[in-house]
Amino acid sequence: MSGEEEKAADFYVRYYVGHKGKFGHEFLEFEFRPNGSLRYANNSNYKNDTMIRKEATVSESVLSELKRIIEDSEIMQEDDDNWPEPDKIGRQELEILYKNEHISFTTGKIGALADVNNSKDPDGLRSFYYLVQDLKCLVFSLIGLHFKIKPI
């Protein structure tokens, strides 16, 4: 494996948010793999909805932008020890493998920025909160564009 291939293989991002409630296990999950594979799943049983699963392949430039977003967030320096524990309201998980570093965060659902500001680690949780917002926005845009554009 060349140095570039090895660097590319050393990258992975996975995000999960979900809970188990009266409509069963409802969740949103997505992951980016080193080969550019984007996997997305959204499960809601509300009004007998079915699970939505999508897969797409993103370009190297999209992966580069994803890496830039992660670097700018400074999330790799954070620690989830003082973040709220998952509870019946739900849980969030974020796993990132990047530049020979691996982080895996688990916390409760964050309803509003006030929850972040009132936590034991507002600065760290704020980094997580905004990074997750950016990642979800990117994923929803990519999935939306990929599956709605009709070829000529």
Swiss-Prot record:
Disruption phenotype: RNAi-mediated knockdown results in embryonic lethality due to developmental arrest during morphogenesis. RNAi-mediated knockdown in the syncytial gonads of adult hermaphrodites results in some inviable embryos and then eventually no egg laying. Keywords: Developmental protein, Differentiation, mRNA processing, mRNA splicing, mRNA transport, Nucleus, Oogenesis, Transport. GO terms for cellular component: catalytic step 2 spliceosome; exon-exon junction complex. It is found in: Nucleus. GO terms for biological process: feminization of hermaphroditic germ-line; mRNA processing; mRNA transport; nuclear mRNA surveillance; oogenesis; positive regulation of egg-laying behavior; positive regulation of oogenesis; RNA splicing. Pfam families: Mago_nashi. Core component of the splicing-dependent multiprotein exon junction complex (EJC) deposited at splice junctions on mRNAs. Positively regulates the nuclear export of spliced mRNAs including the sex determination gene tra-2. Promotes oogenesis and represses germline masculinization and spermatogenesis. Required for embryonic development, possibly through positively regulating the expression of pie-1. Not required for the spatial patterning of pie-1 in embryos. PANTHER family: MAGO HOMOLOG, EXON JUNCTION COMPLEX SUBUNIT-RELATED, PROTEIN MAGO NASHI HOMOLOG. Heterodimer with rnp-4/RBM8A. Part of the mRNA splicing-dependent exon junction complex (EJC) complex; the core complex contains CASC3, EIF4A3, mag-1/MAGOH and rnp-4/RBM8A. This is Protein mago nashi homolog. It comes from Caenorhabditis elegans. The gene is mag-1.
